Amino acid sequence: KTKKTGLVAVIIPNMLNPFFAALTDYIEDALYKKGLKTMLCCSDGIPEKEIAYLNLATQNKVNGIVALTYSDIGNFINPDIPIVVFDRFFENRNIPRVASDNYNGSMMAIEKLLELGCRHPVYIRFHSIFPGESDKRKDGYLAACKKYHITPDFLDMEDCDNFIDMMKQFNISYKTAGENI
């Protein structure tokens, strides 16, 4: 059997998104407490980079992989390396995953926003050609809009190099339009 390195590869799509940054911090801390080191890989959501990082993880004999991916990486996973994916489901593949209850989470978020006085909740979405948990978040948002008689509003993001700048611009555009989102 090949000796492992005590490394776990963590593949994320973006380091600037506050959610991914916080999640990566928690993952790294949990791995460290177990005596493992983190090999952080930022794919920028580019399938070729994700595949290259999977290959790099295999070459470095990692103990495992945690992948937050927007791509169908199922065909490129080394069956000898344990992997878990986050908020992603690959049809016809037995890949362990961690997922939230995105449908009800979205409903709860809209309810909380309305409770806090928000009159126009907007759903910000990033596109992926693969089905995933974001579809359930969208469905929860639409159900909440229907339940509370809100006209759904979507902000489509094709590419986001800087999440924080994007959110600032989004906020400015709605304030300029006189919206209380």
Give the label of every model feature segment.
Residues A67-I73, F86-E91:
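Short, polar loop motifs at secondary-structure junctions
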Residues D29-L36, E48, A52-T58, I81-V85, ...:
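Bacterial carbohydrate/catabolite-sensing allosteric modules
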Residues A9, V66, V122-Y123:
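Conserved beta-strand positions in the central sheet of alpha/beta enzyme cores
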Residues K1-L56, N60-N63, D139-C145:
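Amphipathic helical "hinge" segments at domain boundaries
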Residues N14, S71, H127:
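Flexible, active-site-proximal loop/turn residues at the rims of small-molecule/cofactor binding pockets
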Residues N63-I65, I181:
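Short, Asp-centered acidic motifs that coordinate Mg2+ and/or phosphate
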Residues G74-D80:
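Acidic (Asp/Glu)-rich catalytic clusters
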Residues C42, T69, D156:
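Short loop/edge segments at beta-strand edges and connector loops
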